[in-house]
C-alpha cells in the first residue's frame, strides 16, 4: 500500500508553495503530495524522499531540472547557498504575488464569512533596505578558514561569507570585510558552540536610513585564556573601522561579551570602544533613539508604509484613549499620540520601555504612560478603559488568555499588526 519509501528519488513540478517555503509536488504514479522546501512554483525538480508518514511525505531538493517560467538570475551571488533569503530568484512582483497567495490562503481558512482583502503594499525599496544585520562567525566547512556571514541554508554549523550581500547597503559590505580581515589577522578562533570554546561570535551592524548613523557591535566570548590578543584585536579593529570610507557615519563601536550557550545575540555586558551606544532614526517625521539590542522594524521606509496604514485603520483618535499593547520602543504609540487624548503602552522588555520614554521626550509628547510587564498581567491594573486598541505582538502572537481580556474591553476598533501570519490565523 505505502509504496513511497525513504531514499527514493522522484521528479515532479512544484505546483504551489505554502507558507513559509513548503513546495507541493504531486507524484502521480504514487498518488502522493510531497512537500519539498526551497523551491518556487513552476520549477521541475528532482528530490529524494526523506520522511514518509501516513498521507504525508517530505523530500529534499536535489536539483532544479527546469526553471520556472517566471524565474530570474538572482542579483546576489550567495543566493541558494545562504540561508538569509528565500525568493531572490523571482522578480519582486512575483515574490509579492506568492506571499499574498500564501497569506490569503491562511486567512480564507481562518475567517468565517466575508472580509475585505486589500492586497499587498510594496516596499519603497527593493534591495539594500535593511537597517540591521547580524552576522555569525564560523567556518564554511569543518576546520576551514575563519568565515563571517550567514548560516548556510539548512545548516546549523556552516557559515557562508556574504561579502556581496544585497539586502544591506555598501557600508555593511565594507564593515563585514574589514571585520573579517582583522579577525583573521588576530589568529583568534571563532566560538565553537558544541565545544563551548573560542572567541568570536557575532557582528551586529545597525544603520539608520534617514540619519545614516551607524552602530557596530562585536559579540565575543570572554577573553580568558587568550592573553593579550583580544585587547590587541579590539584596538586594531576599532581603528580600522574608523579609517574606512563609508557613505554613513559611525557613531559607536561596541564590544559585547556573551558566554551563554545559546546561539543568539545576547547582552551580558557591553563596553563602548568608540563613540556612544545608541543612534537615531526618523520615521514619519518623529525621532527615535535606538540601542544595540532594542527592536525596531528592519526596513525603515517599509515601516513608514506599515505605520501609515495602521494610522489609517485606527481612524480618528481625537479625544480617545488608545492602548498600544506590545509597544516595543513606542514607535506606534508615538505615531498615534499627537492626535490622541492619551496613549497607554504595555511592553515586557524593560530596556524597550526605557527607550520608549526617552523617545516620547525627544518628540515632545507627554500624553503617554508606559507600563513594563506582561500584557496578560498588566492589563487588569491599567485602571482605564480604552476607546481603541493597537496590537503589535512578537512572532508567537497574543496569549489566548490575554486575547480574551483584550476583546472584553469591547472597543469599536482594534488594529492587529502581525509579523507572522500563522500566529494571526
Please state what every model-predicted region is.
Residues 205, 212-221, 287-291, 388:
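Short, aliphatic-rich beta-strand segments
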Residues 63-74, 83-190, 210:
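Extended interfacial segments that mediate partner engagement and assembly in macromolecular machines
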Residues 23-28, 149-152, 217-219, 356:
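Short, acidic/hydrophobic/Gly-rich beta-strand patch recurrent on exposed beta strands
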Residues 42, 168, 299:
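Short, conserved phosphate/pyrophosphate- and ester-handling motifs at nucleotide-, phospho-/glycolipid
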Amino acid at each position: 500500500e505505502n509504496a513511497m519509501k525513504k531514499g527514493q528519488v522522484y521528479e515532479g513540478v512544484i505546483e504551489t508553495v505554502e507558507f513559509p517555503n513548503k513546495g507541493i509536488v504531486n507524484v502521480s504514479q504514487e498518488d502522493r503530495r510531497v512537500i519539498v522546501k526551497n523551491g518556487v512554483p513552476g520549477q521541475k525538480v528532482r528530490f529524494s524522499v526523506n520522511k514518509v508518514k501516513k498521507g504525508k511525505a517530505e523530500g529534499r531538493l536535489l536539483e532544479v531540472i527546469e526553471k520556472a517560467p517566471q524565474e530570474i538570475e538572482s542579483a546576489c551571488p550567495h543566493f541558494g547557498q545562504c540561508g538569509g533569503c528565500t525568493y531572490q530568484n523571482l522578480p519582486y512582483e512575483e515574490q509579492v504575488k506568492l506571499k499574498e497567495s500564501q497569506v490569503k490562503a491562511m486567512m480564507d481558512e481562518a475567517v468565517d464569512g466575508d472580509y475585505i482583502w486589500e492586497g499587498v503594499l510594496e516596499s519603497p525599496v527593493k534591495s539594500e533596505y535593511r537597517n540591521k544585520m547580524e552576522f555569525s562567525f564560523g567556518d564554511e566547512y569543518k576546520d576551514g578558514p575563519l568565515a563571517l556571514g550567514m548560516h548556510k541554508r539548512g545548516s546549523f554549523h556552516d557559515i557562508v561569507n556574504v561579502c556581496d550581500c544585497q539586502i544591506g547597503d555598501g557600508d555593511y559590505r565594507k564593515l563585514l570585510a574589514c571585520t573579517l580581515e582583522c579577525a583573521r589577522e588576530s589568529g583568534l578562533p571563532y566560538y565553537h558552540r558544541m565545544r563551548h570554546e573560542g572567541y568570536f561570535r557575532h557582528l551586529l551592524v545597525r544603520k539608520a536610513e534617514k540619519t545614516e548613523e551607524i552602530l557596530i557591535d562585536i559579540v565575543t566570548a570572554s577573553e580568558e585564556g587568550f592573553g593579550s590578543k583580544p585587547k590587541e584585536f579590539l584596538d586594531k579593529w576599532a581603528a580600522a573601522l574608523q579609517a574606512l570610507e563609508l557613505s554613513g557615519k559611525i557613531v559607536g563601536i561596541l564590544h559585547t561579551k556573551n558566554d551563554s550557550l545559546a546561539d543568539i545575540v545576547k547582552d551580558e555586558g557591553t563596553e563602548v570602544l568608540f563613540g556612544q551606544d545608541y543612534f537615531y532614526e526618523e520615521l514619519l517625521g518623529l525621532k527615535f533613539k535606538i540601542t544595540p539590542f532594542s527592536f525596531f522594524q528592519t526596513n525603515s521606509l517599509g515601516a513608514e508604509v506599515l505605520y501609515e496604514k495602521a494610522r489609517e485603520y485606527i481612524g480618528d483618535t481625537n479625544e480617545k484613549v488608545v492602548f498600544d499593547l506590545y509597544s516595543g520602543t513606542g514607535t506606534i504609540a508615538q505615531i498615534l499620540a499627537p492626535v490622541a487624548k492619551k496613549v497607554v503602552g504595555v511592553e515586557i522588555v524593560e530596556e524597550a520601555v526605557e527607550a520608549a520614554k526617552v523617545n516620547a521626550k525627544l518628540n515632545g509628547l507627554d500624553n503617554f504612560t508606559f507600563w513594563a510587564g506582561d500584557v496578560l498581567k498588566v492589563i487588569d491594573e491599567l485602571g482605564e478603559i480604552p476607546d481603541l486598541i493597537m496590537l503589535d505582538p512578537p512572532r508567537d502572537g497574543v496569549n489566548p488568555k490575554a486575547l480574551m481580556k483584550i476583546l472584553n474591553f469591547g472597543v469599536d476598533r482594534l488594529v492587529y499588526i502581525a509579523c507572522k501570519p500563522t500566529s494571526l490565523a
